[in-house]
């Protein structure tokens, strides 16, 4: 992500919120958080999202209007499980030389992704995978500590609910239903 970019983050869980923060820290001009769960969309602005959408279709209309048809520079897929069909929607959200970054893990049996190869070539769009943000721990961790210490990186705010060990099943239910960004079990 570069300063001035329009960024779409699909999936506003823990990884998505950190992608939103990364885009904010990198200087993105507009950051759209896409998630069907209202609670997560509401939380996203606190991490740096400038806009939210409940679906990819809603995000496309919003981004198209915001950019006067130019579309996003980057779309980051941070959904819990990636499906091959998500790439077509993500590619449709980015404009010329747009980049799609996939952080979500796909199902082992799913071996194909979808999208227009013609559009990908004509508009020089890119798709890439990223594991752990493609980080370099010896370089990145000291920088992240500096950002956290300066109040620019929100980590404590990611924990939206704490559970006792007796509440572990409730914690799993909340995780599955999207009622948390991150839950913490204290024992």
Pin down the residues of each PLM region.
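Rossmann-fold NAD(P)-binding glycine/threonine-rich loop
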Residues: 105-124, 141-144
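Glycine-centered, small-residue-biased loops immediately flanking beta-strands
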Residues: 5, 98-99, 125
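N-terminal Rossmann-like NAD(P) cofactor-binding module of classical short-chain dehydrogenase/reductase
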Residues: 76
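Short amphipathic alpha-helix with an adjacent loop that forms part of the alpha/beta core around
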Residues: 59-69
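A generic alpha-to-beta junction signature in SAM-dependent methyltransferases
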Residues: 1, 67, 93-95
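Short strand-turn motif at the edge of the Rossmann-like AdoMet-binding core
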Residues: 79-80, 103-107, 131-133, 158
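C-terminal hydrophobic helical "lid"/dimerization subdomain
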Residues: 57, 88-92, 96, 134-187
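Mid-domain Rossmann-like dinucleotide-binding core that forms the NAD(H)/NADP(H) cofactor-binding site
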Residues: 1-57
């Amino acid at each position: 992500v570069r300063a001035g970019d329009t960024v779409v983050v699909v999936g506003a869980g823990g990884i998505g919120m950190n992608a939103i923060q990364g885009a904010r820290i990198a200087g993105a001009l507009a950051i759209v958080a896409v998630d069907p769960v209202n609670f997560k969309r509401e939380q996203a602005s606190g991490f740096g999202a400038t806009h939210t959408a409940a679906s990819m279709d809603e995000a496309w209309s919003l981004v198209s209007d915001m950019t006067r048809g130019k579309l996003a520079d980057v779309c980051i897929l941070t959904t819990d499980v990636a499906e091959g069909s998500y790439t077509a929607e993500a590619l449709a959200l980015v404009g010329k030389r747009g980049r799609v970054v996939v952080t979500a893990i796909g199902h082992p049996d799913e071996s194909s992704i979808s999208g227009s190869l013609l559009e990908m070539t004509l508009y020089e769009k890119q798709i890439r995978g990223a594991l752990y943000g493609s980080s370099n721990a010896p370089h990145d961790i000291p920088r992240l500590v500096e950002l956290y210490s300066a109040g620019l990186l929100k980590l404590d705010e990611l924990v939206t609910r704490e559970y006792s060990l007796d509440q572990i099943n409730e914690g799993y239910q909340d995780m599955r239903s999207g009622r948390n960004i991150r839950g913490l079990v204290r024992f």
